[in-house]
Amino acid sequence: MFTQKSFEIFSIDGLEARMAEIRSEIQPVFSEIGQKLLTELSAKISNQEFYFHIAQHRRRTANAPENTWSAISTKARGYKMEAHFQLGIWEDYVFIYLSMIDQPKKQKEYAELLTNLSVEKMLTEDFIISKDHTKAEVFPLSAFSEAAERLGKVKKSELEIGRLWPKERFDGKEDSKILAEMLETIDQLLPIYQKLMEV
């Protein structure tokens, strides 16, 4: 599980130095939790094969990443081309999202479906959304409808929906509780995900 050291990594200066710590400290946690999320998904959607990916940030040449993430998708060679699940970390929180980022192939179809879905009624009120995977800012669930509409109208718009866990909770005392909440987050998002995969 993540620890306070996981969050401190984002204070390290320099691309190489920060990436070295991300690889040694954060990515093994992604793998550990990711396998549990993968097992959960595979049990719930048994007729679909899922693949686990870890962001490598290979295109970066100068700036160290301000966040990092892993993803679960139905594609072996990537994840951004479709709606997918993300487990990631910023300097002050960990998140799990159902993500539509970087102009997925069915962006307009996703937007149309989500605009007509009463998402606020399908999820508990502690869910939040992100409109840009490169920014730490999040918005309440009440902002979902507007963001879903924007996804259909603005080519470069993004939409992620899920939960976050503030870094203060990662003191080693709540690890099993946090993991249970993560699995439950996937479970709550599954009906939405399944509808997205049908479009």
UniProtKB/Swiss-Prot annotation:
Domain of life: Bacteria
Pfam families cross-referenced by the UniProt entry: DUF1054
InterPro entries: UPF0637, UPF0637_domain_sf
Signal peptide start-end: none
Similarity comment text for this entry: Belongs to the UPF0637 family.
Protein name: UPF0637 protein llmg_1936
